[in-house]
């Protein structure tokens, strides 16, 4: 069995127990009411038997004794009714106070049973009031009979009072039924008020939670705004640095381009200023072979000096730079003339 089925079974059992309790209370009340009726009938019989003795006694003493007896019976009946009602209310409240087993339908059923019990109580109280009124009237009639000793007039008075009693009892019944309706309405209103109070407490708790969450979100929003501002400031600083570096790079590029252009112009000017010189071959004499070593050294020195004073073609040298060697002043090994390349 599932949890729902077990809960339903528990509720049904509790309802059956409540109904049984209400029925038992009804039976107890009916028994008590029957006992009260028997007591009242015995009291009326005793009063009727005492009426002939009252003829010789004064009327005031008899009326006082009878009123005292009636008041004592009323107080006893009222005390018993109060005790019964308190016990019933306690049991009904115990049934209603079970939060796990009772629902709205169950409460309505219990209320209907309690209202029926209240109606029965009202009817019983009405009957008791009628009996008390009859007793009082009988007492008054006996007092009048003791004074006047006119049984025929007593019968007429009893008949007239009995004719007036139904109207009084109907009014009392209307008042009692109205009170029962008010009790039911009061019970329902209390339930509604309790529900409204519960809803209000829930809504207040939710409102408090939402307000706290709103405050937390506001603080988070403020923190996020501050972090965003800081990041924006940092980004602005980085952008300024980048812009400065870009400007420096642009100026460096411009300077480099200007330097390259100047170098090109200088090279062009140097190329224009240089004049091409023809290749000159050295004049070799045959007598040079017969020269002495000292003479050959002097001749080579003069040739070297002459070669240094020569103007060299820079264009040709640049063309053969780094892979050709200038061998114009070199002397070949062996015999033969010295040639200039």
Curated annotation (Swiss-Prot):
Superkingdom of this protein's organism: Eukaryota
| Modified sites of kind Phosphothreonine | 292
Any one GO BP annotation for this protein: Golgi organization
Q: Spans of biased composition, class Basic and acidic residues?
A: 7-26, 118-132
- Residue ranges annotated as compositionally biased, kind Polar residues, are 69-78, 158-171
The annotated regions of Acidic residues compositional bias extend over: 79-91
- Phosphoserine modification sites? 87, 170
Named from the GO MF annotations, one term is:
identical protein binding
Annotated Basic residues bias: 27-39
The Gene Ontology CC terms held by the record are: cis-Golgi network; cis-Golgi network membrane; COPII vesicles tethering complex; cytoplasm
Q: Which UniProt keywords apply?
A: Acetylation, Coiled coil, Cytoplasm, ER-Golgi transport, Golgi apparatus, Membrane, Phosphoprotein, Transport
Which residues lie within the region annotated Disordered? Answer: 1-181
- Give the protein's function: Involved in ER to Golgi vesicle-mediated transport by either facilitating USO1-dependent and -independent tethering or increasing target accuracy of fusion events of COPII-coated vesicles.
Name assigned to this protein? Binder of USO1 and GRH1 protein 1
